[in-house]
Amino acid sequence: MLHIDAYKAPKFLAPGHRVTGERDQNGRARGLGHTVVIAVQDDHSRLVYAELHSTENAVNVSITLTRAAAWMREQGCGAVEAVLSDNAKCYTGHRFAQTLDELGARHIRIPPYTPRWNGKLERFFGTLEDEWAHGRTWPNSATRDRALSSFIRYFNRWRPHSAAGGRPPITRVQQDRRHDS
C-alpha cells in the first residue's frame, strides 16, 4: 500500500527573521506562494518518492503517483495494491481514479478530520520540515528546492528509522527480497 499527500513549503528570497533576528517587515517579500512537495510512501518499508510541483492538482498528483509506483517497483516493493489518500479534490476526481485503474490499485480514502490514518506520511512531513525545510539556513527557496532529491536519497538510504529497528527504509526492502528467495 502507498500513502500519498502533499506538503507546502513557502517560497522566500532570503533567510527570514529566525535566522537574521531582524523583525522589520518593510523589506519582506509577500505573496511568493508555495512549492508543493507531493510525496508517496510505501507502507511497509517507509521508502519515500517525492516531486516538487507548483500546485497540487489532479494532473501533478497522477503523474507523481505513476512515477512513484514505477520507482517503488524498481526498488523491489512490488506492485501497488492500494493507495491511501485524503479527500482533497485532486484525489477524488476522474484523473486520479483513472491512474489508480492503470496501476490496478484500489483507493482507500481517509475519513475527514482524521490525519492520523496517514500518520506515516505525516511523520515524514514533520521530518521533511525539520531536516530539509528548516534544517539549515538556505539563501533562498530555489536553493532549498534543488536539495530535495539529495534529502530524499539520504532519508531512504542512510537515515535511521525507529520503525525499522534503527536502519534506513531501503534495508526493509532488501531484507524482504532475501526472505522471498
What is the predicted function of each stretch?
Residues A79-N87, D101-K120, R136-P139:
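RNase H-like polynucleotidyl transferase catalytic core
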Residues D5, V40, R46, L65, ...:
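Mobile genetic element proteins and their domesticated derivatives, centered on retroelements
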Residues M1-A14, K89, A97-Q98, T114-P115, ...:
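Basic, flexible linker segments flanking DNA-binding modules
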Residues M1-A39, L47, I63, S181:
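Mobile-element integrase/transposase regions
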